[in-house]
Amino acid sequence: MSGPHRTFSFEQRGDGEAHSSFMDHAMHPQYDDVSPISNMSSSPGHMNETHHGLASVPEDNHQGWGQARGPSPSNRTGFTATPEMDNLGPASVGGGISGIALGVANSHDRLSGVEARRGTDGQEANIPAERGYNTTGSDNPYIPAPPDMGGYGSSETLHPRQSYGSNVALGAAAGPAGQLTPGHSATHLGTSNSSQRNLYDAPYQSAGGLSAGPYQRHSAYSSNDLPLDINPEEIADDGDDGFAPAGNSRSSARRSQAVPAAAGGAAAGGVLGGIGGLFNNRNPAETSYDPVPGAGLEAGEKSQWVKPKPSTGSRKRGWIIGAILAVIIIGAIVGGAVGGTIGHKDSGDSASGSSASTQSASGDTDTNGDLDKNSAEIKALMNNKDLHKVFPGMDYTPWGVQYPLCLKYPPSQNNVTRDMAVLAQLTNNVRLYGTDCNQTEMVLHAIDKLDLKDMKVWLGVWIDTNETTSRRQIDQLYKIVDDAKDISIFNGAIVGNEALFRAGDNKITAQATLTKYMQEVRDHFKKHDIKMPIATSDLGDNWNAELVQIADVVMSNVHPFFGGIPVDQAAAWTWRFWQDHDVILTQGTDKRQVISEVGWPSGGGNDCGKGANCPDDTSGAVAGIDELNKFMEDWVCQALDNGTDYFWFEAFDEPWKIEFNTKNENWEDKWGLMDPARKLKSGLKIPDCGGKTAA
């Protein structure tokens, strides 16, 4: 989509941040979408109080890549990439870096369209810097500088999308049944303006500014109930399975609550989303695309949606359709409840054929035993010549680790073992998003059973507005680390994923709370003589000097796809954005810098920085196998050669995220290198980098 091109220049401020000024040039294309990479500024002047984080992000008019820059303030909107839910059932083939992310590069919930801009000052500059990109320079280590393209709109001209963690479901299907309890907490990461929230978006809103996380799947219905009036004050649960607070901006743009309960429930998630619009009246003129944080583990993490309100002339037809869909929903819920115990991602021709598709987690173990490296099924999975260990890290969230659903339908240890058997052929470094449902313990057990001596784990702690959830997560982290026989298997602990992004205009308060949690973890480790890096991950533009000071590692989510970046420029843009917004913040320190999420969808349409509003189907960032191959070709081996540290998002598709798809944006469930059954996608080629492997 064309639009005025903006040139930005930085003016160094006393606080170490850069201030951007810009000029509009009507002759150049502008990429106006929000990416999971964008983040929000703490400066109140850059953000409307009703917006959940969309703010202008200063960016300079770069002449070359990789050159030292002054720190860039983080004035972004929320995104979350990144995943962790297994609505498909405990026995589901665990190949899914479920959840948050896409969040994916910057984040976590994604949002586009009119809703993405709601609450902003109306200026195109109020967008994440990661969304746009400038012409490439000769300093880029990935690809030769291309000819002048006339200047692409900087990321500032892009609308932010919410990002997702790998544990976050991008679609309604991400929300498992049973997680209805609204979250509420006294201590939260920032308080958003609840008075401006639409009750349809979040009937039971959290007190905090952070939308629900990957662990919180929002659903309007439980596996046993149809829509009913619920008094959140009467619910005894801690609420981490409740609705994520939805703001009028990204977070508020939720579709109707939909929750697939089992493998067969993924499709039902889409139906639920449609029905929500019939059972509830809502005013938005356009449908917004934005997963709720908390529908998956990192879209927790994430999943309320908004459907257009039926016009008066179509009300009767709407009720008829609603009645029909209600019948389907009831069947889906009933089937989901049953499927929750049998959901299995297995496919007939997958290597895990020994596991019946109707098995529960315990049934899988009863039939196959506790899988290990000597199991025939595991040997087959670990002998895939098309997989190469060229990724420094992989974002991963096992299926079925959404609390409290996992209490009723426990995740499958064997599925985690199967996943790890595959992941071990891609990387020696796995990143988790949370500690609920024994997911960390299952990963450690799988590593032991498979004898993966080189495999390391980045522990994840999900932080959100619900203090009970955060407390449970942190306490479990302590238990895991304190009970570990050898902590050398841990590369570090990531406290929070895109917590600042989800805080919206309350980023300052959220950062204070986040750093408090980080310091608490640091103090605990010190007290127990545990030497382990402490970090947090957020949109690339959300990092600032204060956050860098308390973190041992700067971890940023960066997604070129949501910036509408053509794939032949994506690798260069990603590296440059990371260098100019994150790496530069660590100059003069010994802090490491890591891209915590980066990837490309294998299908579903194209994004021109403004969602699917492209003039044709070849403009902007195009999702596809060829494009995914191109991005890996330009990024993977070069990153391996120059030592760029990153986590790929992601290894496995997450089918439940289909609910987040729209008519022209059908990529939410297609970020994996493999399908849910752990089979490499047709035509996809993972670079072998001449035999070189990641450490």
UniProtKB/Swiss-Prot annotation:
Gene3D superfamilies linked: Glycosidases (3.20.20.80)
Comp. bias (Acidic residues): 231-241
Topological domain ranges for the Cytoplasmic compartment: 1-317
Statement: the UniProt record of this protein carries the keyword Glycoprotein: yes
Glycan-linked positions: 415, 438, 466, 642
Residue spans crossing the bilayer: 318-338
Sequence ranges of Polar residues compositional bias: 36-45, 188-198
Catalytic activity from the UniProt record: Hydrolysis of (1->3)-beta-D-glucosidic linkages in (1->3)-beta-D-glucans
SUPFAM superfamilies: (Trans)glycosidases (SSF51445)
Database matches in InterPro entries: Beta-glucan_modifiers (IPR050732), Glycoside_hydrolase_SF (IPR017853)
Region ranges (Disordered): 1-53, 117-140, 175-258, 286-314, 346-372
Topological domain spans for side Extracellular: 339-695
Name assigned to this protein: Probable glucan endo-1,3-beta-glucosidase btgC
